[in-house]
């Protein structure tokens, strides 16, 4: 039998698009995939960001409240409808509290576990795993958030994942860019071929809440991704959210 994996990315709670996130959780509950992977930047954690250093936001004391929002809007609703395996990559935003501690309070680093996102969000209590930086998500495929491994980030959809694919020599699925795109590349000689695939998942963030855009519209696409696995066969598929709807296998979900 085939296996289906749902991959979501860059919710950046509390700046998530709440309607989109709720609809995707509803889809997961309706279809019961074999695995759910959040590919990183589950959280935003703006207070310890380098961009807010020295501003009022740095003193907002919102790490705990934001973590509670994640529990209420993502982890609790997800576990109410789905009891299968859930794994989360640590994105660059997810580790902002830890990075802040290392940089500005090194005397307290022995307490670093208290600032790790898996503990702030009680992953153990929700039965959620922290995935390795490079996760063998399917035969011939790895998933990673996309901010590490020497990957060159570009502004065109799928090109960052393509750079990762060529660097790693395997099919790759990433988040980080907030863009959606799929791009293959064929290698071989003498008519023999090996096709590698690269995919960027998109995001479930509310762009209007991204203050660092300063009112601009970024080249981001809302949606998520699917991997359908049957033995060594892996089909990558993007699910864009457009006009308040998305569709999978001929069925439409409203946002």
UniProtKB/Swiss-Prot annotation:
Database matches in Gene3D superfamilies: 3.60.21.10
GO MF assignments: hydrolase activity
Lineage top rank: taxon: Viruses
Protein name: Gene 54 protein
Origin species: Mycobacterium phage L5
Encoding gene, per UniProt annotation: 54
């Amino acid at each position: 039998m085939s296996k289906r994996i749902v991959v979501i990315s860059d919710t950046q709670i509390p700046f998530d698009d709440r309607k989109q996130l709720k609809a995707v959780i509803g889809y997961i509950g309706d279809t019961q995939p074999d695995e759910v992977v959040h590919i990183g930047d589950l959280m935003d954690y703006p207070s310890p960001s380098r961009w807010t250093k020295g501003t009022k936001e740095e003193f907002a004391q919102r790490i705990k409240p934001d973590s509670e929002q994640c529990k209420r809007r993502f982890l609790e609703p997800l576990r109410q409808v789905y009891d299968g395996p859930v794994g989360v990559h640590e994105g660059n935003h997810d580790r902002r509290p830890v990075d802040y501690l290392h940089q500005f309070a090194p005397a307290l680093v022995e307490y670093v576990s208290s600032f790790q996102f898996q503990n702030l969000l009680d992953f153990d209590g929700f039965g959620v795993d922290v995935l390795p930086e490079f996760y063998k998500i399917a035969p011939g495929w790895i998933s990673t958030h996309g901010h590490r491994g020497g990957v060159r980030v570009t502004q065109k959809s799928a090109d960052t994942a393509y750079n990762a694919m060529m660097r790693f020599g395997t099919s790759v699925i990433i988040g980080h860019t907030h863009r959606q795109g799929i791009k293959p590349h064929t290698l071989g000689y003498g008519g023999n071929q090996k096709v590698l695939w690269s995919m960027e998942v998109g995001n479930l963030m509310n762009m209007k809440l991204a203050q660092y855009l300063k009112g601009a519209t970024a080249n981001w696409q809302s949606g998520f991704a699917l991997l359908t696995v049957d033995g060594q066969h892996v089909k990558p598929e993007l699910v864009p959210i457009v006009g308040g709807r998305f569709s999978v296998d001929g069925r439409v979900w409203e946002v």
